[in-house]
Amino acid sequence: MTEELLKAESCFVLRAEDRADMFAQVYKKLLEQRLVAAGFLDQVVDREEDFPTGLASCNLAPGLPNLAFPHTEGCFVKQQRVVPIKLLAPVSFKSMVDPSRELPVGFCFMLLDQKADGQAELLARTMTFLSQAEPAALSRIFAQTDPAGLYSALREEGF
């Protein structure tokens, strides 16, 4: 990833009651950083309900947390960014493969892009990183418990 897509101030470690609470906490921080527009929260919640982004991590390596890649329409985004979110306790996301299945997700990569097809590009780049990283490196990244450590671990692995 390029330096512009990953910023220390946009790496979060948080505890959320549920998916809606996680979205609300992250939205507040992104709004303060002027990365998203008003309306982003409702849109990301609605889009996640209609087009789930949860993904079981079993194909990457055993023992890794399930992942999610929430995003929304570009008109609600002010600046391109990949926002890593470590969840201290898993929250439930619907599976993108089987939306009838709920997954306990422990880590999210929120994708912010103003372009209509930008999220697909960011998703592809993020998935390439995840599929090429060593399982031990991913374990180290996903084990971080503070934002600075999360940012450092991602940068050290070339994200």
What are the functions of these language-model segments?
Residues M1-F159:
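Cytosolic covalent-transfer regions centered on His/Cys nucleophiles
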